[in-house]
Amino acid sequence: MSIDWSQAITSERRAAEQALADYEVWKVERQARVDALVVEVDGLVFDGNEISTRRMADVIAAADDLADATEWTLADNRVVVVTVRQLKQALRLSTASRTAIWNDGRPA
């Protein structure tokens, strides 16, 4: 019986594999935090996840005026009329929160 030393697991390799595993766990946890993100504007609680913020950006881009209004489904699933100004503020808060989450606790 011979030993295949090419299959030996070094402490460096083990550390690299653990670092990769830690990073993958962190990414899943980070995405869960982003998916659950909510922000409040004028007493209205908006979903702040990536899909919702893309929708906000679409409405803002298509608006003629910040006073324009549209129906919006809030985080609690109530449909209300909101202004583009409110959506813009919700987008700004969501983006800032997501940016803070994005690198918080990143494994080395």
Language-model features, listed with the residues they occupy:
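A preference for well-ordered globular domain cores
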Residues: 1-108
